[in-house]
Regions:
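Extracytoplasmic small-molecule ligand-binding "clamshell" domains
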Residues: 19-93, 153-154
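Periplasmic-binding protein-like
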Residues: 27-29, 106-111, 185-223, 242-246
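Extended ligand-binding regions for polar small-molecule ligands
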Residues: 49-55, 116-131, 135, 205-239
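Acidic, polar ligand-binding/catalytic clefts
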Residues: 62-126, 133, 137, 196-198
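Short helices/loops that flank or line small-molecule/ion binding pockets
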Residues: 68-82, 157-178, 185-186
Length: 246
């Protein structure tokens, strides 16, 4: 796997001004985007950031942390960068800070996955909606606040999938590509499917910083100038928008 990446990077010329930075990343498994295996950060996020660092001559040291601590350490200045991030995530806690965000580094859709026999049956049957703790099902907040939908949270994605497969929830609000990756590895590939007719959030993942906007500018230029490499990494990891395939 790494051999392919090295070959791709042969055409990238490192630039002057190399530095070492600490990048805070999520400890939770979220493949194909990212995971932590035996203490090592892996996945699309790792390969993308490594490719950028190689071009610039920077050194990225990855610090996997639980989601809540990751945000706190980032805002308290203990990390140089946070990935992934999004301007909407914990926006209230970020209000007092000047956070610099990159251009979109990866597409991400959060939506509802249901059993195939329930595909296209509408929001009315969603009485119990499962999601991962820390996730916000934005399109369904009004219904949750009104008591029309009961939100059930779990720490682990596999726990949520088990709930859906055992009809303990009517659907799960997650990233479809992450769910399909988990189901593929458990030989239950078609047991839950993304329902595009239900409300979903079409979004992106970004790199963020408090103190290094110049590196964010470098990263933005990398995403543009090395678009072919970035797309190769997306294809390699199966990263795409499930609605468009891109």
């Amino acid at each position: 796997m790494r051999v392919l990446l090295i070959c791709l990077l042969l055409g990238l010329a490192p630039l002057a001004g190399a530095e070492t930075f600490t990048v805070g990343v999520e400890l939770q498994p979220y493949m194909p985007y990212s995971s932590v295996v035996e203490g090592h950060y892996v996945g699309y996020g790792r390969d993308l950031l490594d490719a950028f660092a190689a071009q610039q001559g920077h050194v990225f040291v990855y610090q996997p942390l639980p989601v809540r601590r990751l945000l706190n350490d980032f805002l308290n200045g203990r990390l140089d960068f946070k990935y992934p991030d999004n301007p909407r995530w914990n926006a209230d806690k970020k209000q007092a800070y000047k956070v610099y965000f990159s251009q979109a580094a990866a597409p991400a859709i959060d939506g509802v996955l249901v059993k195939p026999q329930f595909l296209g049956q509408g929001k009315e049957r969603l009485r119990r909606l499962g999601t991962q703790r820390g996730f916000t099902p934005w399109p369904y907040l009004d219904d949750i606040k009104a008591g029309k939908i009961l939100l059930i949270q779990a720490n682990q994605i596999d726990s949520l999938l088990a709930m859906a497969l055992n009809d303990r929830v009517d659907g799960v609000y997650l990233n479809p590509q992450v769910v399909q990756h988990q189901l593929y590895n458990s030989t239950k590939t078609e047991s839950l499917v993304f329902d595009p007719s239900l409300a979903h959030q079409d979004d992106y993942y970004f790199l963020s910083t408090l103190n290094h906007p110049e590196v964010i500018e470098q990263f933005d230029a990398f995403l543009i100038n090395q678009a072919e490499l970035v797309q190769t990494l997306k294809d390699r990891h199966g990263i795409s928008n499930p609605l468009t395939g891109h």
